[in-house]
Amino acid sequence: MFNSMKRILAILTVGLPALFQTSAAQSTAANTVWIRPENAKSPPVWGIHGGIVVGLWPASLEGNIPGSEGGPRGLLRVGYELNGVIYLINYIAVEPLVDGDMEFSEVRPSVVDGKLGKLFWAASDTTGGFSPYANTTGVITHPDKSHPEVEELSVYILMEKFADGANPYLKLTIRSDKPGELGLQLFNHKNSAVMQRCALTATMGNYSRLRLLYLKDKVIDSRQLFGGYDDIEFAEKDPYPVSQMLRNKSGDPVVMAESNESFNQLASWPQSPPYLARWHWRYRPFYKLTQYWRVDAGGYDSSLVVRVNGRAKYWSGENADKSNYIDVPGGPAFENFELRENYHNGQQFYFGLSLKPAKELIDGF
């Protein structure tokens, strides 16, 4: 596998990321709903019109942004397509726990080039080495015999083995009848170390200024939960057990998060030099979205919890100089937003985006 990675490294260092800045993905024929690569050499982006989109480094979901290489490595880029335009909304990282030690896919160095971020790549099955291209257009199936019109797009996401021996991989799915939802199923290769947990965490809640966390009997406000915190580190509190999660009509545990701000407030940006120099944190979509996690009823155990942390200032890498940080307008917001559960091979999570406000989504979910 790593010999294949090293051969590709030479390509990566001669400007390939710039190629992907200019093209997010090619749609299939106009009468279909899917966003898929045209061929194996296209940028690695998959999704559905009017719904969720997922991509891998070095592809940028938003096209040509100066200085961009599609965002950090070691992450799934999760976006939303509306009216022909895709916007990046969040990232999802992979965080395996082995013998009490947790690794972070976006900040641990690659064994290929020593740069931060594990290499992720797509495949139509569980074999093959790294490529910066799509490798596969994805597989379309009909998962519901009672509704043969429903289609499901699936693709495998493979990644470098972690330093602690963890060797997980993902199967991503999007269903045509649930366009706002991304299925993420976790597996491990046979040579993987035993994982106590393998968290999938949405890492960029500050971008959407997520401040309201909806549980069964209460709404947690990040401004109150992290009130008074004004440092550059993450603020952490205890997780919430599955017993406190919402349930949808099928009995699935669900947790939702949204901004407390109106769209006009969310889209505004301070007009001062420190903020203008960090405009990539400005919220760019022309709509608000509710974000949520879900698990299937009966498909989880009592270890399932909701975990959030917070930040009062936007992330600025590992930089310890506080002058490189700017305050999140409006106060502390949730940054990492995730479900955690004891690992088992094949466990399934769903991450969703909806144009509906959380209260409206809860009523009809």
What role is predicted for each listed range?
Residues 1-5:
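N-terminal secretory signal peptides that target proteins for export/translocation
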Residues 10-18:
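Bacterial N-terminal signal peptides
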Residues 21-25:
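Sec/Tat signal peptide C-region and signal peptidase I cleavage site
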Residues 26-118:
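Beta-strand-rich N-terminal accessory domains
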Residues 27-52, 57-60, 244-365:
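Beta-strand-rich recognition/accessory modules
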Residues 105-117, 122, 225-271:
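Low-complexity, serine/threonine/proline-enriched polar segments
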Residues 112-180, 185-191, 195:
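Extended, loop-rich substrate-binding clefts of extracytoplasmic carbohydrate-active enzymes
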Residues 171, 177-238:
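Acidic (Asp/Glu-rich), glycine- and aromatic
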